[in-house]
Design a protein with these regions (language model features):
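Luminal/periplasmic acceptor-recognition loop/helix of membrane-associated glycosyltransferases
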Residues: 5-9, 461, 465-557
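Flexible, glycine-rich phosphate/dinucleotide-binding loops
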Residues: 82, 165, 294, 480, ...
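Membrane-integral, polyisoprenol-dependent glycosyltransferases
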Residues: 1-272, 298-411
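Membrane-proximal, lumen/periplasm-facing interface regions of secretory-pathway glyco-
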Residues: 58, 92, 383-387, 418-464, ...
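A generic local structural motif
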Residues: 143-144, 351, 457-458, 511-517
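Transmembrane helical bundles and short interhelical boundary loops of multi-pass, membrane-embedded
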Residues: 1-8, 251-254, 276-281, 288, ...
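Ser/Thr- (and often Asn-) enriched beta-sheet segments in non-cytosolic proteins
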Residues: 240-244, 359, 399, 417-423, ...
Length: 557
C-alpha cells in the first residue's frame, strides 16, 4: 500500500510531531492580525486557483457522473423534470449508488439553462460550492476553538488534495462534502446569531439529496443540532423552528429510504415529488455475520484511509501519479489531534458556552455519521483496506480534517518552529499536487474520462444532422454500475441533445447497444464503438474515423 515517497513524507511529519511534543513553550504567542490575514488570504487564493483554472480542459473528456449531472440539469431546465419519467425525484435512477443524488443537477440547471450546456457550465457549480466551503471551514474552526483553529482548518480545506480533486469531479455525491461544513458553520454560529440556524438546517437537510448516505445521517444530525441549540442558544424558539424546517425538507428523503429498505412500492408525494423504488439500493443491514465492533472498526479504518486512498488511487483512476505521498502527513496529525482532544475532554476545564455548543454539534454529527455507516453503509464500506465504498466514506472526511486541525493547533501551541516546518511540508505537498494536476500526470491518469468518445459522439451528431441516420452507441465504455445507462448519458452530453425530444427519439434516432465481434453493421446506420470491439467487422461500404481508441463508422458517401 505504501510507496517509498509516501513513507518519506510520513517520516518527516512524524519527526516534526515528536520535535514539537518534546520541545515546547514558545507557541503560546499569538500571531499578528496582519500575518494571520496574509496566510488566510494566500490559502484562499491558492485554493480558488486550483479549483477553477483550466476547468474545461482538466480532466479532458467526460465521465458518466459528469454527463448525468449535465444532462439532467438541462432536462430540468427545459422540461421541469428529470429524464425518462422521473419528474422531480429524490434519487436519479439511471444507476443505483451514492453518486445519483439530484441536488447538484438542480444547482447546475440555471447555469446550463442560461448559458448553454458546456464543460464550464456543468463543472462550475460544484467548483464554486467548494470555494464557498473554504470560508465556511474557517468559520467552523473559529466556532470550535478560535482563530488558530480557523486558520488551520482553512488551510486544510483549501489545499488538501481530497477537497481539490473532488471539486473538479462534477459528481453528484461530492456536493455533500462541501455542504456539510457550510451547514455546521452556520448552525454553530446560530447559537449566538439565531438567524443563522435557518439556512444551516436547510443546508444540512439538502445533503440528503446529494448523497444517499445522508438519508440516514441528516435527520439525526438535524435533531441533535437542534437539541444542542435549544440547550445552549439564546433564543430557543429559533432552534425549534429551524430544526422543524430542516426535518420537513428531509421528509421526501426519509420516504425514499423507507421504500427501498422495506420493499414498499414507490410513490408520488403530493403529486409532485417522485419517491422511487430503486433496483439496486445498496444500503442494508449488511454483513450480519459481523459483530458491531467489527463493523465499527471497518468503518473507522475505511474513514481514515479515505484520506490516503480516496479517488481510487490504488487503481490509478482520477488521480495523479504518486498522490499517495500527498496524503501521508495526515496520519500523525490525526493521531495527535485525537490525543489532544481526549486530553482536553478529561482535564475538567470548561469551554465558553458558544464553543461548547459548536464542539457538541460536531461531535454529535460525527457520532451519527459513524452509527449510520455501521448500520446502513454500502457493502464496500466493510472492505477494511478503504478502497471501496468511497462516497459513503466521504461522510467522514470532515471529521478527519477536524482531527488534523486539532493536531496542527497542538503543534503550534508547543513550538512555533515545528508549526512552520509543518506548513512547509504542506506547501511542498500542495506544490506537488499543482504540478501534477496541471503538468499532465492528472491528464494521463484520469482514465475514466473519455475524450475520444466525446469527439466521436460530436462527429456522429454532425453526420446525423446531414443524413438522418440512426446512431448506435456502444454500452461497453467502462465497468460502470449500469454501463449502458452511463454510455447513454455520455452520448447525450457530448451531443448537447434537446431534452424535450430525447425520450421520443430513444431507440429511433439513437440507441445504446452491446457490441460483439461477430456483429455486422446495418448499411444505413452509424456506429460508435471502441476500436477493438469492431476489429473483426466487415466495414466494406463504410467510412471509418478514430480518436483515442474510439471508432466511428458510417455509410460511405
Amino acid at each position: 500500500m505504501f510507496t517509498m515517497d509516501s513513507l518519506v513524507f510520513l517520516a518527516i511529519a512524524v519527526a516534526i510531531l515528536f520535535a514539537a511534543v518534546q520541545r515546547g513553550g514558545d507557541g503560546a504567542r499569538t500571531m499578528s492580525e496582519k500575518t494571520h490575514r496574509a496566510i488566510c488570504g494566500a490559502a484562499i487564493a491558492a485554493g480558488v486557483l486550483v479549483r477553477l483554472v483550466r476547468l474545461t480542459s482538466l480532466p479532458a473528456g467526460i465521465s458518466a457522473e459528469e454527463a448525468l449531472v449535465g444532462v439532467q440539469a438541462k432536462a430540468l431546465w427545459q422540461t421541469g423534470g428529470f429524464l425518462f419519467g422521473q419528474g422531480l425525484t429524490t434519487q436519479l435512477s439511471q444507476w443505483a449508488g451514492e453518486t445519483t443524488g439530484p441536488l447538484l443537477a438542480m444547482l447546475t440547471a440555471p447555469f446550463v439553462g442560461l448559458f448553454g450546456m458546456s464543460k464550464l457550465t456543468v463543472r462550475l457549480p460544484l467548483a464554486l460550492l467548494s470555494c464557498a466551503a473554504m470560508p465556511a471551514a474557517y468559520g467552523l474552526g473559529e466556532a470550535l476553538s478560535g482563530r488558530r483553529a480557523a486558520r488551520w482548518k482553512l488551510l486544510i480545506a483549501a489545499l488538501c488534495p481530497i477537497f481539490v480533486l473532488e471539486a473538479r469531479m462534477t459528481c453528484g455525491s461530492c456536493a455533500a462534502l462541501y455542504l456539510l461544513p457550510i451547514a455546521l458553520c452556520l448552525i454553530a454560529h446560530g447559537v449566538t446569531k439565531p438567524a443563522a440556524l435557518y439556512p444551516g438546517m436547510i443546508v444540512l437537510a439538502l445533503t440528503a439529496y446529494a448523497q444517499d448516505m445522508y438519508f440516514f445521517i441528516a435527520p439525526a444530525a438535524i435533531l441533535a443540532c437542534a437539541i444542542i441549540a435549544l440547550i445552549f442558544g439564546r433564543r430557543k424558539r429559533h432552534a425549534a423552528i429551524s430544526g422543524a424546517i430542516g426535518l420537513l425538507l428531509y421528509v421526501p428523503a426519509m420516504l425514499t429510504a423507507f421504500v427501498n429498505l422495506t420493499g414498499a412500492e414507490g410513490m408520488t408525494l403530493l403529486g409532485l415529488i417522485r419517491i422511487p423504488r430503486l433496483e439496486g439500493f445498496e444500503k442494508t443491514f449488511m454483513a450480519e455475520n459481523w459483530s458491531v465492533g467489527d463493523k465499527l472498526w471497518a468503518v473507522l479504518i475505511g474513514g481514515v484511509f479515505q484520506v490516503l486512498r480516496h479517488e481510487n488511487i490504488h487503481q490509478a483512476m482520477y488521480t495523479p501519479d504518486g498522490m499517495l505521498a500527498l496524503f501521508m502527513f495526515s496520519l500523525p496529525l490525526m493521531a495527535l489531534g485525537a490525543l489532544a482532544l481526549f486530553a482536553r475532554w478529561t482535564d475538567g476545564r470548561r469551554a465558553a458556552r458558544e464553543k461548547a455548543a459548536a464542539r457538541a454539534m460536531v461531535a454529535a454529527t460525527g457520532a451519527v455519521t459513524l452509527a449510520a455507516l455501521v448500520m446502513f453503509g454500502s457493502v464496500g464500506t466493510l472492505n477494511t483496506n478503504g478502497t471501496t465504498g468511497l462516497f459513503d466514506h466521504s461522510a467522514l472526511i470532515l471529521f478527519d480534517a477536524v482531527l488534523m486541525t486539532a493536531g496542527l493547533c497542538t503543534i503550534e501551541r508547543k513550538n512555533l518552529r515545528c508549526a512552520a516546518a509543518m506548513v512547509a511540508l504542506m506547501a511542498v505537498n500542495f506544490a506537488w499536487l499543482a504540478v501534477q494536476l496541471f503538468g499532465g500526470s492528472y491528464q494521463a491518469n484520469a482514465n475514466v474520462y473519455f475524450s475520444g468518445f466525446e469527439q466521436m459522439a460530436a462527429r456522429a451528431a454532425e453526420i446525423q444532422a446531414e443524413t438522418g441516420e440512426k446512431i448506435n452507441v456502444t454500452g461497453n465504455i467502462y465497468p460502470h454500475i449500469q454501463p449502458s445507462d452511463g454510455a447513454e448519458m455520455m452520448f447525450l452530453y457530448a451531443t448537447d441533445a434537446d431534452m424535450r425530444t430525447v425520450e421520443a427519439e430513444r431507440g429511433t434516432r439513437y440507441e445504446t447497444i452491446y457490441v460483439s465481434d461477430d456483429m455486422q453493421p446495418e448499411a444505413d446506420q452509424i456506429y460508435l464503438a471502441r476500436a477493438d470491439e469492431i476489429s473483426n467487422w466487415d466495414l466494406e461500404g463504410f467510412d471509418y474515423e478514430e480518436s483515442e481508441g474510439y471508432a466511428l463508422i458510417y455509410p460511405a458517401r
